Amino acid sequence: MGISELADFLEQNFSKKTYTELSANQNKSLIQSSKCEAYDFDEITEYIFPQNKPSSADAILLDKNRIYFIEFKSGFHRKMSRTNFDRAQCRCEKIDDICDDYAKLMKRHLENIESELKANLFQKTAESRWTLEYHLLPEAYKNKTYPDLQIFYIIVTDKVKEDPIDAMGQIMDDLANIHNEDNFYERMEQSVKHLYCESRYRKKAFYDKVEVYSVQDFETFFLN
């Protein structure tokens, strides 16, 4: 038994959408132009839970015996962030100098924004897996035992979409195998992996693998 029962269930009850549609947020899509398609997992979750819908990934993709959840997340790409914070931007005209109190508040605000985005992602990874395991798979396979499937969670962010300098820095970090707290993708991956890929007993928890992609990398590996 493979993944065919789940594929048939989704095909009978839902229509696929392009990644341009799936990545849209407030009339702006992370994936600008793509004819590749996947299922809308938000729609599937709403079908299962007409009321009190849990949070969910944007898309679900089936490939052989693998299930990919895909989350398109904007908000990480900002002119000022926790890692590029510049105190000079907190200059006060009244005192003609940098306002230390304002600088501290601004840095804390930027840290809170990133923490909130991460918390939202953590909730989606957990509740998406719960919906799949205890509701979607039992619905698709009825009373049958469903196969041992590999479950992946892919996070696509706008971190370097319009910032070639940041993108080049990331490429250089990767080539040099640099691991530090300023490497955005590594910090994100390690955070999610710690919670959902490896339990405290060094055993698989919710996912076989979690990866964080820039838009460019996602387009290269998934859409070509």
Language model regions located:
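Basic, amphipathic N-terminal segments that precede the first structured/catalytic domain
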Residues: 1-57, 219-224
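Short, flexible loop/turn elements at secondary-structure junctions
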Residues: 26, 30, 43-45, 63, ...
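Acidic (Asp/Glu-rich) sequence patches and key acidic residues
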Residues: 56, 66-69, 79-91
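Short, flexible/disordered intra-domain loops and linkers
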Residues: 85, 110-117, 165-176
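Acidic, metal/cofactor-coordinating or nucleic-acid-engaging core segments within structured domains
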Residues: 87-146
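Short, low-complexity, polybasic intrinsically disordered segments
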Residues: 146-219, 223
